[in-house]
Amino acid sequence: MADEQHKQDLFIKQQCTNIFRERRPMRLPAELNTITAFAIVCFCFFPASGAADDPKSQPFPQPPSKKGLQVQMVDDAIALGIHHAGININLTALFQPAANDNTIRFSYDGREWLMNGAYAASLDNQIRPLSEKGIVVYVILLAYPSRDPARDAVMLHPNAGGEFTIAGFNTASDDGLRTYRALIAFLAERYSGRHAEHGRVWGWIVGNEVNSQKIWYNLGAMPMKDAASEYEKAVRATHDSVREHSDHGRCYLSFDHFWTGRMPGVSDQESYPTREFLVEFARIARERGDFEWHIAHHPYPDDLGNPRTWLDKLATLSDDSPHITFKNLQVLCEYLKKPELHWNNQPRRIILSEQGLHCLQNEEGETLQAAGFAYVWEKVARQHGIDALIWHRHVDHAHEGGLRLGLWTNKPGTVSEPDRRRHIYELFRKADTDEWPAAVTFALPIVGLESWDAISP
């Protein structure tokens, strides 16, 4: 009976995909039971209460699968059957201190702002083909240093310093915060769904791994409560700008796998346990007037260089676990059930917006990576609080500390030019299809399970 229900669920998903993504006609076989047929018709043709033709009031999409990817090659991503996509946006590149031939002039907050038209067009080329296929697009909002002092003075947090990859947004000065609001307003309007030529964005991830801010959201040395306060200003500004154009667009806080632990070798003024940071952020948000925000978590294994995440020792089932990795995702789901963290009496939603498994350079490397993905997929499928698993990476990247996380290898001598597909590629394609159960039986003895049902929900 369970197998039959599973087949019917997959059939419903496929029919809805045919209708919404491929624009193919619905085909209901004569033997399909009445309840299943009714479910398909209701899901596909009767929108949720309150839905309207106006893009602003459309509800947040509920795609039939959690499968997602940080996309490098759009056509390949679509062929893989993804329903969620992550796209990086470098706000420093979008902002222009002075006009040139490609400038877009944008009026907001009583003044004119200059946007990099060429960069905006490059974002369109990534976002539009994905959203046209019904894929839910999430953007990761980042501030990379440009080495242009005038630009960086506006965009980067003035306390940022030392060696870092990404800076915190400049929420410390009036000019910086106004500029940030204008940039988000520009993007929110452009990708609101009113302009088919640009595409649509539904999810807005603010910064990157802010609990480990020294490297990934540099605010300089400051106590955790001050860092949470600065970050709250950026998230609130994002939410307010997005909601001007989308009643149900979502904003997300970005955290890495350190839960009660924190980044080793870094001071407690530059890295913080996620749990403490989250509680402080929520307190500040309530104090200033609560608003809707959600979680974008990165559950990498304990050791990013070891794909055997099922063996993670620092990921326990305790609320005091040092890490939250793939192995113990339920800890985060349970923690968000605390009433003081709720929004509208419901737990905040979770997406897994960046994570992958390293491919070892030995004869078992590809098999271990693929087996790890099978374990991850089965684990995520059982977590009802998680909406999306957005895999990282599409293609190996030469400047990622020696990690090889891709579905594709990169060509030797290139940074990220695709070379060949790994074993994990076909497994990823088969996820959430009727090919999946047979494709992952090889992984059970590798991860030490007799059945996927043995995975803790």
Task: Identify what each model region corresponds to.
Residues 22-37:
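Bacterial N-terminal signal peptides that target proteins for export
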Residues 36-45:
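Bacterial N-terminal signal peptides
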Residues 53-93:
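Boundary/entry segment of secreted carbohydrate-active catalytic domains
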Residues 67-69, 85-87, 137-141, 204-206, ...:
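Hydrophobic faces of well-ordered beta-strands that scaffold small-molecule active sites
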Residues 69-79, 186, 190, 275-283, ...:
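Short, acidic/polar
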Residues 83-106, 110-264, 302-303, 397-401:
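Substrate-binding cleft and catalytic face of glycoside hydrolase catalytic domains
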Residues 163, 200, 210, 215, ...:
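Aromatic-rich peripheral "rim/lid" segments of glycoside hydrolase catalytic domains that contact
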Residues 183, 188-189, 200, 226-366:
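Noncatalytic carbohydrate-binding groove/subsite architecture in carbohydrate-active enzymes
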